[in-house]
Amino acid sequence: MFMINILTLILPILLAVAFLTLVERKILGYMQFRKGPNIVGPHGLLQPFADAIKLFTKEPLRPATSSTTMFIIAPVLALALALTMWSPLPMPYPLINMNLGVLFMLAMSSLAVYSILWSGWASNSKYALIGALRAVAQTISYEVTLAIILLSVLLMNGSYTLSTLATTQEQLWLLFPSWPLAMMWFISTLAETNRAPFDLTEGESELVSGFNVEYAAGPFALFFLAEYANIIMMNMFTAILFLGTFHNPCNPELYTTNLIIKTLLLTMSFLWIRASYPRFRYDQLMHLLWKNFLPLTLALCMWHISLPIMTASIPPQT
């Protein structure tokens, strides 16, 4: 039964990823005054499936000098971790209801760094290695601010359990009292998922394609699936944290519909940003985090910690 539960979670995610690739190409197309994919199926709707068949039926080439085991394990690990991170998300009922769901998600996103590092190192190519090192430095750096912002939100939530966020936000979205945190969180999720304008890992002009330059066919498709599954997951996490949805136990499908609409809008903004902004320079990327975001998030975190202590002596304002 548990296997069926897992499959009912994984298959819709993979389907959503397939159509996200199509939506991205369509949006980029319309923003550049062209149509995008429109040949395969009605309005190009079957394009993702054609791409999948093409990629998975090609021969997976491997450089002769690469480290075989790591080279094969890295893409599988990337996708496995990307799909594992969905398990504690309440939609409205999570696959695994954890008390420390937030910590689990932080740990999983930290582990995702290893798949990138292994793929870059195992490829035995200087471009792949530089791309992987950039990705690791960027991901680890932005995880610092993500963790501090999460801590601030959880201080308002009063629990590490994600399902209680719906109760916390019954009256007011956390976006309003903590909008600076929400804005920094959104920009940090862009950097965490290696999306434009922070896609320095795959700077075509300098690194060919980044850490996955030596990958082809199936393994390359696995990296691609992992990246897009992470994008949707991060946006759903943002919607749960800052745009809390009211959960009525008698009508749980309303919660799901509401959450999916919010996630879709956030994902669209990811694609819109990709079409609108050029890539950052690497030193600007690091400057933004260590000199701007980190002091601000630390100050706001201290404020959220001291607020309940300062107001502890005030009688209840009802």
From Swiss-Prot:
Any one Pfam family match given in the protein's UniProt record, by short name? NADHdh
Its predominant location is mitochondrion
| Example of a GO cellular component annotation carried by this entry | mitochondrial inner membrane
**Molecular function via GO:** NADH dehydrogenase (ubiquinone) activity
Enzyme's top EC category? translocase
* Key word Iron-sulfur present: no
Cleavable signal peptide:
none
Q: Reaction catalysed by this chain? A: a ubiquinone + NADH + 5 H(+)(in) = a ubiquinol + NAD(+) + 4 H(+)(out)
Record keywords, A-Z: Electron transport, Membrane, Mitochondrion, Mitochondrion inner membrane, NAD, Respiratory chain, Translocase, Transmembrane, Transmembrane helix, Transport, Ubiquinone
What does the UniProt entry say about where the protein is found? Answer: Mitochondrion inner membrane
E.C. no? 7.1.1.2
Fill in the subunit field for this protein: Core subunit of respiratory chain NADH dehydrogenase (Complex I) which is composed of 45 different subunits.
Describe its function: Core subunit of the mitochondrial membrane respiratory chain NADH dehydrogenase (Complex I) which catalyzes electron transfer from NADH through the respiratory chain, using ubiquinone as an electron acceptor. Essential for the catalytic activity and assembly of complex I.
Q: What is this protein called?
A: NADH-ubiquinone oxidoreductase chain 1
* Organism, as annotated: Balaenoptera musculus (Blue whale)
- Name the gene for this chain: MT-ND1
